[in-house]
Amino acid sequence: MEKQHVFIVGSKGIPAEYGGFETFVDKLVQYQSTDEIQYHVARLSDRNDEFMYKGARVFNVKVPDVGPGKAVLYDLIALNACLEYCKKMDFKRAPIFYILACRIRPFIASIHKAVEELGGVLYLNPDGHEWRRSKWSWAVQKYWKTSERAMIKDCDLIICDSKNIEKYVREEYARYDPNTIYISYGADLEPSVLADDDEKFTGWLDEKGLRADEYYLVVGRFVPENNVETIIREFMSSSTTKDLAIITTENQSLYNTLERKLHFSEDPRIKFVGTVYDQELLKKIREHAYAYLHGHQVDRKSVV
């Protein structure tokens, strides 16, 4: 029996380094339970080639730096590569094209038509409320919203990883009668392979000036929607003797803005500790946090 070919476009690719979609795709191929599926995953790169990773075919996509439109161009180039690959291979079984996030409004109708001509189907994960992000200008927010509407209208199946997102899609776009399904993300419940006294963990604690079980932990991208400002402000007003460890991406502009507002650098308990891409180390850091603070406002998932 011919394999079911699934083409995934919209993440930055695998192996995952950061991001919810990237981690989702990485775990999807890692825990594949049948050999009847062949995944093809687009990966943003500075070259055009391909390689195998955990059984998935990963194809690199080189995209010119065109500024804010780079992500849109990446999706389009990747989708075109998927379509051309399918034409060349002439699969007997209908291919599945799975798009992550709603970026390509002006092109979705023609893409859907091309997929249909191949006998394929088009799936979409609409992500969170991207159009609500305060980092976007009004015009960009408007584009995200109209792109969301067009893509939900033209895709064959909307896969939601949040019950609230599925409810929103069904209610907001009821006139299109969208075909939706809720599929939650799994969770890795296995403890870290690192021992409590592993030098990798203890060395990290020493480097960051932290003590095991004596810190509150925040993990997520450093963007306004993750409410880092609120977390820091309220933490500064507390009397706890524990630290606040913030594992996050770099955003110097936001960092400077919050420093001007809050003067958090004067509070030695608050520690920006950079990113952690070693998943076993990150697990161990989470295991020894006194508590985890989650301030995410528009995301459904958060992995750093």
Stretches with model-predicted labels:
Residues K3, V9-E17, Y31-G69, N164-E166, ...:
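N-terminal strand-loop element at the rim of the active site
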Residues F7-V9, L205-N226, I232-S239, A245:
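Conserved donor-binding/catalytic core segment of Leloir-type glycosyltransferases
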Residues R43-R47, A187, V219, K242-E259, ...:
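Glycosyltransferase donor-sugar binding loop
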Residues V72-E84, A94-P126, R300:
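An aromatic- and histidine-rich active-site surface loop
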Residues V140-I158:
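Membrane-proximal helix-turn-helix segments that form the acceptor-binding/catalytic region
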Residues I152-T180, A187-S192, F201:
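A short, active-site helix/loop in glycosyltransferases that binds the activated sugar's phosphate group
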Residues V193-G209:
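A short helix/loop element that forms part of the nucleotide-sugar donor recognition site in Leloir-type
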Residues K284-R300:
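Acidic donor-binding loop of glycosyltransferase active sites
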